[in-house]
């Protein structure tokens, strides 16, 4: 029993050495990924441009709303201004076509973008207007509460 205890303590003491070796390997992988940044940007731009090209041939409002949502989501973590542009286009089209669910979804996207920029009070005002109802789809309800969690989590952390 005593030998087992000594072995366990010895292994625990060697653990930081092993972790440090792993970190150097992880740094190498990270450096390699950073070197490929231009390639990743090119792939992302091509993907977004393909969606934009497809949008030229779409005539139904429902399909345009789907494409605007794809573009907004594609730009969300990539380029704030472009994401907000497609969110606003989606809001206008959803309101014009009287599509309540898409209007709420674009407001959620707008709220998420505002949260990333620190506009917590503005995000809260939007969230209060679009609280889900029982008849709303479950994915919308989930997204709403997830966004609300993000709002209050960020607000409490950074303010």
Which residues does each predicted region cover?
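A "functional boundary" signal
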Residues: 5-6, 16-159
């Amino acid at each position: 029993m005593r030998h087992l205890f000594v072995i366990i303590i010895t292994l625990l003491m060697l653990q930081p050495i092993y972790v440090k070796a792993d970190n150097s390997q992880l740094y190498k992988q990270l450096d390699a990924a950073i070197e490929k940044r231009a390639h990743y940007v090119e792939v992302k731009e091509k993907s977004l441009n393909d969606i934009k090209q497809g949008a030229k041939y779409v005539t139904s409002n429902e399909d345009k709303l789907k494409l605007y949502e794809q573009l907004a989501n594609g730009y969300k973590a990539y380029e704030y201004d472009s994401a907000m542009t497609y969110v606003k286009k989606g809001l206008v089209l959803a309101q014009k076509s009287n599509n309540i669910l898409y209007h709420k979804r674009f407001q959620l996207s707008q709220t998420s973008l505002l949260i990333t920029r620190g506009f917590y009070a503005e995000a809260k005002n939007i969230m209060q207007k679009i609280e889900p109802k029982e008849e709303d789809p479950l994915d919308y309800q989930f997204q709403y509460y997830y966004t609300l969690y993000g709002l209050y989590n960020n607000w409490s952390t950074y303010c």
